[in-house]
Amino acid sequence: MSLYRSLVFVHVLSILVLLLCHGAAFTVTYVLRQERRPERIGVLLDLSLASFDSRRALGRIFWIDLLVVVGSGIGLMIAGGWWRSWWPWLSVAVFIAIVLAMRELGGGPLSQLRRSIGLPWIAGGFGKPDWKEPEAPSQKAMESALSRLNPTSLSIIGVGGFAVLLWLMMFKPF
């Protein structure tokens, strides 16, 4: 088996692991829109956070796997001689756009929701977030955070973005 095919295998497998890590968070965003009980919201938020919290085993797997996705992608660009083509650079830009959009539209409202119900919350950061102490719960802040959460937009960005990435990787249009 060639180095290139081995890297393709690692890259695709690591993307599948990355998507698997998002399963609970994906479901939670839909369930949260219907929930108004702070204690249940807290449990759902903890479930969602488990996939990304670098203090937990699954969160560490997620962040290490993200490095494998990026590293194998760079390796494929070099091993395949694709770094001179446009499609891999567009793939990088699309991937970064997906990450930033998900952080803004998913991570931001979820962190504000944690804050609004009196849980420790994240002020920012990737991988090593800046955790803040719990504040007094606020029904108004909770409703505001829930109204900002749009699971349909997150789904469109995630599925649509990865469809674009898949198209670029499979068809290498330019």
Predicted regions and their residues:
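Polytopic transmembrane helical bundles with strong interfacial aromatic enrichment
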Residues: 1-174
